Amino acid sequence: MASLRSAHPADRIIVALDGMAPEQALAFAAQVEGLRWVKVGLELFVQAGPEVVAQLREQGLRVFLDLKFHDIPATMAGACRRAAALGAELITVHACAGSEALKAAQAAAVEGAQGAGQPAPTLLAVTVLTSWEEQRLQRELAITQGIAERVPALAQLSATAGIGGCVCSPLEAAALRAQHPEPFALVTPGIRPKGAAVGDQARVMGPAEAIAAGASQLVIGRPITKAEDPSAAFAACCGELLG
C-alpha cells in the first residue's frame, strides 16, 4: 500500500458495516456523504455473499474484506485468490496461520487480482484481536507472552512472509511503525472519537492520536453507524484528523 501521509482524511477512515442486513448496509453506505472506504465483515459477507463487494464497488466505494482467513496454506491461498478477484483492496489473514500459509496467501492474492483485472490487494495480518486483554490471553489460551511482545513478533513474521501490513490496536501502532516504516500498512480498529462509548473494545484510542502514533487507516463502526446523523459523525471524525 502506498503511503497515506498526505491523503485526504476520508481515505484514512474505513467505516465498518457491522450488524447490518445487506440492504441496510448498501443504503447506509450510499447515504454517508464523502465516504470512500467500507469494511465488510463475516456477518455481512455470510448474509449477502460475495456480490456485496461488487455492489459496494458499484457505488464507488473501496472495500476492506475483513474475513480473517486462518487455515492450512492451500485453503488460505484459495480463499485469498477468490477475495482478490472480487476487487477487495484490503483482505485480512491471521498471522497465527504461520509463514507458509501467509506466503501462499500473498502469492495467490496477486494471482487472483491479475486474473480478474483488478489491482493487487494489500493483505493485512491480524496479530492480537483488540477485544483481548493480556490476563485473559494467559488464562484462556495459556499464552504467557505479553501482548507487547506478541504483537511485534507476529507483525515481523507477517512482514517477512511478504504481507503488506497488519491489523493492530492503536496502542501498539507506535511500536510497530518504528519497526515497520511505510508503506507497511497499519490498520487500527478500537478507534473511539470524542464522546463515543468504548463498547467491546479493550484497547482504544482517538482518531488523531492513532494517526499520530503511526496508523495508516482507522476502522470506525458504531460511533458513525449508530449516530443520529452518520454523515455528520463521519465528517466530525475527518475533522479530528485535520485538527
From Swiss-Prot:
GO terms for cellular component: cytosol. SMART domains: OMPdecase (SM00934). Its EC number is 4.1.1.23. The active site is at residue 68. One of its GO terms (biological process) is 'de novo' pyrimidine nucleobase biosynthetic process. Substrate binds at residues 18, 39, 66-75, 130, 192, 201, 221-222. One of its GO terms (molecular function) is orotidine-5'-phosphate decarboxylase activity. Pfam families: OMPdecase. It comes from the Bacteria. It catalyses: orotidine 5'-phosphate + H(+) = UMP + CO2. Pathway: Pyrimidine metabolism; UMP biosynthesis via de novo pathway; UMP from orotate: step 2/2. Keywords: Decarboxylase, Lyase, Pyrimidine biosynthesis. CDD domains: OMP_decarboxylase_like. HAMAP family: OMPdecase_type1_B. Homodimer. Belongs to the OMP decarboxylase family. Type 1 subfamily. Catalyzes the decarboxylation of orotidine 5'-monophosphate (OMP) to uridine 5'-monophosphate (UMP). This is Orotidine 5'-phosphate decarboxylase.
